[in-house]
């Protein structure tokens, strides 16, 4: 599965998409395809006609890191790669929103807990207690 080149927000979609649009996308995508074998996929926004990707994490909510050390706080059980042009105004100035530029079309996917958006790889499966400890530290901060 591939998305076109461009600027994207990589984050839990509930941090970057406003309430009404978020509710519409949940309905249109059957809750971001949480029951699909690949735990998500590429969807097309019915309003902007832009493609975006969403994949469920292995353990649901928590705090997950990519290979570069960026932390992704997750409260909706998934991580997305959403074109900046699709987002009117994100809901939060959260430190968990990663703005990434992709110079050419890139692969997205999920494999045994690893969510991949081009060069961004986010491991969501492993030591569950470690993820929960990171998440609790973030909540307490």
PLM regions and their residue ranges:
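Intrinsically disordered, low-complexity acidic regions enriched in Pro/Ser/Thr
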Residues: 1-141
């Amino acid at each position: 599965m591939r998305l076109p080149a461009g600027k994207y927000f990589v984050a839990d979609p509930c941090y970057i998409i406003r309430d009404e649009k978020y509710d519409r996308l949940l309905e249109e995508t059957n809750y971001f395809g949480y029951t699909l074998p690949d735990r998500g996929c590429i969807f097309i926004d019915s309003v902007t006609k832009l493609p975006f990707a969403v994949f469920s994490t292995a353990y649901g909510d928590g705090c997950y890191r990519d290979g570069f050390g960026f932390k992704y706080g997750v409260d909706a059980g998934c991580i997305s790669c959403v074109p900046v042009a699709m987002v009117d105004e994100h809901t939060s100035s959260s430190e968990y929103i990663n703005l990434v530029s992709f110079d050419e079309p890139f692969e997205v996917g999920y494999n045994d807990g690893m969510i991949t958006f081009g060069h961004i790889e986010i491991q969501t499966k492993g030591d569950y207690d470690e993820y929960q400890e990171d998440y609790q530290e973030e909540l307490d901060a």
